[in-house]
């Protein structure tokens, strides 16, 4: 059964946009080339928010990707760059990536907040705005 991962990150300042985009593009390319990857979608939302949606053959494939290469190097930086960060994972019948509305619903219902050093009021209250597609 395919394993789906959705992440939403919001940069706390535009000053982090260029380095974030470099890591995001490198991580996206890394994901597409990783063992077990079935699909990758990215969304640049409003208010410096960014979404990723990936499908994997199994959760171990996603975890191997997450702990290697560009993605691994980016993760520690996000503690300072982001003021909102959330992630959700689930299994589904098909390998087709869900729409952003379903990804948002899963993030709200099943997601968890990731640690950031300077959380916004939305991060503290666990409010996750709907994506603007």
What role is predicted for each listed range?
Residues 1-49, 61-64, 85-133:
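Short S/T/G/P-rich N-terminal loop/turn motif that feeds into the first structured element of a domain
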Residues 59-87:
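An amphipathic, aromatic/His-enriched active-site/gating alpha helix that lines ligand/cofactor pockets
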């Amino acid at each position: 059964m395919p394993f789906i991962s959705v992440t939403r990150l919001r940069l706390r300042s535009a000053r982090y946009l260029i380095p974030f985009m470099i890591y995001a593009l490198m991580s996206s390319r890394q994901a597409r080339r990783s063992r077990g990857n079935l699909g990758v979608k990215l969304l640049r939302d409003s208010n410096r928010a960014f979404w990723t949606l990936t499908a994997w053959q199994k959760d171990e494939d996603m975890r191997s990707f997450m702990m290697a290469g560009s993605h691994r190097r980016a993760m520690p930086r996000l503690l300072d760059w982001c003021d909102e960060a959330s992630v959700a994972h689930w299994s589904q019948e098909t390998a087709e990536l869900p729409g952003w509305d379903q990804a948002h619903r899963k993030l709200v219902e099943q997601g968890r907040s990731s640690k950031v050093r300077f959380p916004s009021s939305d991060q503290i209250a666990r409010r996750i705005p709907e994506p603007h597609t």
